[in-house]
Amino acid sequence: MTKIKQEIYNKRPTSPHLTIYKPQISSTLSILHRMTGVALFFVVSILVWWLILSKYDNNYLQLARCCIIKICLVAFSYAWCYHLCNGIRHLFWDIGYGFSIRAVNITGWCVVVCSILLTMLLWV
């Protein structure tokens, strides 16, 4: 590298490193929305397979009484409720509402609270 190129390269702005970056609610919820979407695809596939097997063998149906399976089903319910609520939030964004920083933060927390409440409503 020539001396001029080296000087230009050294003066370029650098991006903040991840260790000093504070995650925001919007970025965290965006990543969580993608993760729940992928997880729901696989979990629904497994649930359909499990339901088909339980039709032919009652032992698979007895698995639903296991505590670990119940915890997994509650986690699945939360992921589904979260993905639903955040999808509704995205629909409002698609029509042009809620793009201010304040609105994004408020609706983000509303999505988290509503998904918890919906999950509790499903299991109580």
Swiss-Prot record:
Cofactor note as given: The heme is bound between the two transmembrane subunits.
Topology versus the membrane: Multi-pass membrane protein
Segments on the Periplasmic side according to the record's topology features: 56-67
Gene3D superfamilies: Fumarate reductase/succinate dehydrogenase, transmembrane subunit (1.20.1300.10)
InterPro entries recorded: SQR/QFR_C/D (IPR034804), Succ_DH_cyt_bsu_CS (IPR018495), Succ_DH_cytb556 (IPR014314), SuccDH_FuR_B_TM-su (IPR000701)
Cytoplasmic side: 1-29, 89-103
SUPFAM superfamilies with a match to the protein in the record: Fumarate reductase respiratory complex transmembrane subunits (SSF81343)
GO MF: electron transfer activity; metal ion binding
PROSITE patterns: SDH_CYT_1 (PS01000), SDH_CYT_2 (PS01001)
Keyword match Transmembrane helix: yes
Binding site for heme: H83
Pathway participation: Carbohydrate metabolism; tricarboxylic acid cycle
Cofactor(s) the protein requires to work: heme
CDD domains linked to this entry: SQR_TypeC_SdhC
Keywords, sorted A to Z: Cell inner membrane, Cell membrane, Electron transport, Heme, Iron, Membrane, Metal-binding, Transmembrane, Transmembrane helix, Transport, Tricarboxylic acid cycle
Transmembrane segments: 30-55, 68-88, 104-124
Annotated GO CC locations: plasma membrane
UniProt xrefs under Pfam families: Sdh_cyt (PF01127)
Localization terms from the record: Cell inner membrane
Major subcellular site: membrane
Role according to the record: Membrane-anchoring subunit of succinate dehydrogenase (SDH).
Protein family: Belongs to the cytochrome b560 family.
Family matches, as PANTHER family: SUCCINATE DEHYDROGENASE CYTOCHROME B560 SUBUNIT, SUCCINATE DEHYDROGENASE CYTOCHROME B560 SUBUNIT, MITOCHONDRIAL
Name the UniProt record assigns to this protein: Succinate dehydrogenase cytochrome b556 subunit
Organism expressing this protein natively: Rickettsia typhi (strain ATCC VR-144 / Wilmington)
